[in-house]
Amino acid sequence: MIEPLLCGIVLGLVPITLLGLFVSAWNQYRRGSGMLDMD
């Protein structure tokens, strides 16, 4: 059985991790070809 604490930690960390990866990928994209296209 899954412990409530472990379940809460996973549910808390997963969205933060996905958000962090998305933001870092978006920043790298903007820093790369995205900036050239905007200019």
UniProtKB/Swiss-Prot annotation:
Entry GO CC: cytochrome b6f complex; plasma membrane-derived thylakoid membrane
One term of GO molecular function: electron transporter, transferring electrons within cytochrome b6/f complex of photosystem II activity
GO BP terms, alphabetized: cytochrome complex assembly; photosynthesis
Compartments it resides in: Cellular thylakoid membrane
Entry keyword DNA-binding: no
Membrane topology summary: Single-pass membrane protein
TM helices/strands, residue ranges: 5-25
Main location: membrane
UniProt entry keywords in alphabetical sequence: Electron transport, Membrane, Photosynthesis, Thylakoid, Transmembrane, Transmembrane helix, Transport
Superkingdom of this protein's organism: Bacteria
Stated role: Component of the cytochrome b6-f complex, which mediates electron transfer between photosystem II (PSII) and photosystem I (PSI), cyclic electron flow around PSI, and state transitions. PetG is required for either the stability or assembly of the cytochrome b6-f complex.
Subunit structure: The 4 large subunits of the cytochrome b6-f complex are cytochrome b6, subunit IV (17 kDa polypeptide, PetD), cytochrome f and the Rieske protein, while the 4 small subunits are PetG, PetL, PetM and PetN. The complex functions as a dimer.
UniProt family annotation: Belongs to the PetG family.
Protein name: Cytochrome b6-f complex subunit 5
Lineage of the organism: Bacteria, Bacillati, Cyanobacteriota, Cyanophyceae, Synechococcales
